[in-house]
């Protein structure tokens, strides 16, 4: 049986909720949204369909995703434009589209369906493939370099911090031992090294034993959390007053950054005991979601990748007194 095209296999997560949250901000004459993680263009396609006067600027660091999404969205003509960059360069993307402020920014974080499904990219532990994991194939650092050239101490730190794996010391030691004879070149070789380090009793408790190691390596290779820490404040600063920022994350490290940045903007900055809250002390953001919203049971059944999604959204309330900062 012939496999469906990649764009047809991708099902956007929490799509209806994203559109409903964006809708109040798009009630303007010529609204513009930045899709900061374009991927296969699923969310953008739905936005352009639902809001006929909307323009969307899609951002992605993955040239393959930009090419596929561009073909899929070609029929929308000048209502869609794409830019090859990382999503911390949101202001530059807006400027390239000819706007200073936008009405909404959407983040669908983490690894994309395209990257997981394309075996040769090396993101998935379930396929044997070259150790790569680069979201941008033109980037220099790959998982091969990290696995084979980083010291045991550095590997341990990455797997513990980015993978939140308590067996990080054992896994790092096993990787260094395995590469002593010859470099680890494939995902299967890496999986074997991880399996040898994780106790048998623990291998069946939290899914695949290599899941957290692969997450850690992917984050390291693509500097995902560093980029995200810059991107959320940049997004808040790029939306107009009344504009909205929506972020979907897929693991606790991403969600923690989003939560903290949104909470910081939603707090008063008035000094404790200050008798009057001055305008410059008032919150910049209003949180629109109660905690992190999750996909319902039906969506999770239809789209298993939605199971780990956590959605948070904010609205910008006022201008900031210090340019370039929403805090």
UniProtKB/Swiss-Prot annotation:
Disulfide bonds: none
Subcellular localization: Cytoplasm
Keywords: Cytoplasm, Methyltransferase, rRNA processing, S-adenosyl-L-methionine, Transferase
GO terms assigned for molecular function: rRNA (cytosine-N4-)-methyltransferase activity
Top-level enzyme category: transferase
InterPro entries: RsmH, SAM-dep_MeTrfase_MraW_recog, SAM-dependent_MTases_sf
Catalytically driven reaction(s): cytidine(1402) in 16S rRNA + S-adenosyl-L-methionine = N(4)-methylcytidine(1402) in 16S rRNA + S-adenosyl-L-homocysteine + H(+)
Pfam families registered for this protein in UniProt: Methyltransf_5
Residue sites binding S-adenosyl-L-methionine per the record: 41-43, 60, 87, 108, 115
Gene3D superfamilies in alphabetical order: Putative methyltransferase TM0872, insert domain, Vaccinia Virus protein VP39
E.C. number: 2.1.1.199
GO cellular component: cytoplasm
Chain intervals for the UniProt region annotation (Disordered): 292-327
Free-text function comment from the UniProt entry: Specifically methylates the N4 position of cytidine in position 1402 (C1402) of 16S rRNA.
Protein name: Ribosomal RNA small subunit methyltransferase H
Source organism per UniProt: Kocuria rhizophila (strain ATCC 9341 / DSM 348 / NBRC 103217 / DC2201)
């Amino acid at each position: 049986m012939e496999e469906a095209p990649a764009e047809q296999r991708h099902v956007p997560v929490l799509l209806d909720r994203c559109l409903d949250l964006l809708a109040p901000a798009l009630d303007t004459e010529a609204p513009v949204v930045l899709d900061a993680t374009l991927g296969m263009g699923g969310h953008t396609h739905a936005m352009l369909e639902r809001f006929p006067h909307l323009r969307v600027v899609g951002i992605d660091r993955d040239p393959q995703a930009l090419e596929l999404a561009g073909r899929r969205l070609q029929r929308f003509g000048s209502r869609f434009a794409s830019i090859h960059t990382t999503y911390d360069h949101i202001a530059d993307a807006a400027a390239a589209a000819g706007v200073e402020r936008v009405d909404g920014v959407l983040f669908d974080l983490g690894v994309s369906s395209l990257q997981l499904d394309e075996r040769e990219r090396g993101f998935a532990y379930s396929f044997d493939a070259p150790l790569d994991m680069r979201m941008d194939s033109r980037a220099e650092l790959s998982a091969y370099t990290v696995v084979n050239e980083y010291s045991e101490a550095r590997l341990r730190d990455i797997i513990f911090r980015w993978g939140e794996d308590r067996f990080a010391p054992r896994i790092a030691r096993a990787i260094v031992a395995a590469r002593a004879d010859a470099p680890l070149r494939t995902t299967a070789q890496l999986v074997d090294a991880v399996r040898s380090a994780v106790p048998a009793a623990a291998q069946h408790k939290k899914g695949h034993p290599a899941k957290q190691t692969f997450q850690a390596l992917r984050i390291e290779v693509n500097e995902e959390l560093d980029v995200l820490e810059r991107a959320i404040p940049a997004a808040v600063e790029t939306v107009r007053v009344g504009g909205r920022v929506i972020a979907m994350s897929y693991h606790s490290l991403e969600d923690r950054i989003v939560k903290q940045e949104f909470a910081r903007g939603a707090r008063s900055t008035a000094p404790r005991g200050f008798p009057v809250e001055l305008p410059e002390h008032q919150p910049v953001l209003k949180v629109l979601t109660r905690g992190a919203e999750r996909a319902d049971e039906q969506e999770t059944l239809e789209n298993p990748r939605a199971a780990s999604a956590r959605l948070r959204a904010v609205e910008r309330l006022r201008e900031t007194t210090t340019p370039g900062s929403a805090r």
